[in-house]
Amino acid sequence: MPNTIELSFHVKRHTDFELLRIIKAQEQGFEEPVTAFLCGVAIRARTGIGIVFGHKREDQYGRFGDGHLIRTSDVIKAEREGRFWVLTTVNSRYVIATFQRGNGRASLREFLRLSQGMHHFTPRVLQ
């Protein structure tokens, strides 16, 4: 018996509706390259939180793999491109395929309201 350890990380399967929205987003095309597509998104503390699909930096260990929960770095701007919202961070662009039920869209509206003219990013080092 080999000495192997198998780790299973929490993974959420995408629903048919989410996959359909992702396909529509991929078909639409975007002005700049997209890092990943996110489902079930809510914005909390200037970061996007959702379930990732098609991340460009997925590695051999499953980091950023489809179905994994992701917390983006600070969102610099959120704007609508065609039928979809795009979250832009320092190094990435995430397309929102679906919002979290109940408070996802409300969190985007709140982010847009609070971020107008105010850019107070998370400090790199806490004192």
Annotate the PLM regions.
Residues M1-I76, S115-Q127:
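N-terminal non-globular leader segments, chiefly Sec-dependent signal peptides
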Residues I76-H120:
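Short, compact, well-ordered microdomains
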